[in-house]
From Swiss-Prot:
It holds the Pfam family Coq4. GO terms for cellular component: extrinsic component of mitochondrial inner membrane; mitochondrion. The keyword Transit peptide applies. Residues 260-290 are annotated as: Disordered. It comes from Phaeosphaeria nodorum (strain SN15 / ATCC MYA-4574 / FGSC 10173) (Glume blotch fungus). This is Ubiquinone biosynthesis protein COQ4, mitochondrial. Its cofactor is Zn(2+). Its main location: mitochondrion. Residues 1-32 form a transit peptide. Belongs to the COQ4 family. Coiled coil: none annotated.
Amino acid sequence: MAKRVCVGDLRKLAGSVSTPSRCILPPHARCFSVLNRPPPNYEGHIPLTVIERLGLAVGSGLGSFLDPRRADLIASFGEATAQPHFIYKLRDRMLLNPTGRRILRDRPRLTSTSLDIPRLRQLPPNTLGYVYALWLDREGVSPDTRATVQYIDDEECAYVMQRYRECHDFYHALVGLPVFREGEVALKAFEFANTGLPMTGLAVFSAFTLKKAEWRRFWDIYGPWATRNGAQSDDVINIYWEEELETDIDQLRTRLGIEKPPDLREMRKAEREAQKKDKEAKETMTRAAV
């Protein structure tokens, strides 16, 4: 005899059968999408999917290659390509160094206020602090213009990227390279050999956009200098710049194993003067021949 089934039993039976086409997620699970992002890991953090990170890397990389003056694109490309491997490796190198560990623990920030730029201008002429302040004044730049890190997922690694970014002007002052393109390419080559960050490597490729004379100087002088010194010197990310401001800059270079390259501004000036004299000589010969 068939068993009688009431309507309530049918409803219970239907509710106990899962529908194959639907995937039931745990209550705490969240889909990662542009419209439904997981919470940020720190203030200002913007999580990215793999596709978004790839798009950011390609777009900002091409843009910064075509226009190296776009600091925002350079910063975005640096963050998009630094993880998952390179920024962690740089962080690990800091953890292996006593000074690097102190920097990670203290988390200092390099700003015009924290550095007290007016005080640095009063230091003895050959100190790092004085040379740094003089370099800022000559190049017309400020330590307060560095963008805040947004796309690095790990909070500690985000600080490492921020620290690298804020230390960039100290690298300029330490080796005496200016901020125009030729100087930036040389410094980025030094940074690539020292830090291994992909963004610095891409910047080296912009050497192909240099003028003929600039390319010749980079190939003959500044490229070899950058590769040699970046590879052989101490990790510049592990320098506690705030504690070296009153250090003699020549002694600091010696301690770090960094040779100061030829003065790029003086070389460019000498080349312009030579071109001017050559032009005047040709004009004189032309007038004499007439």
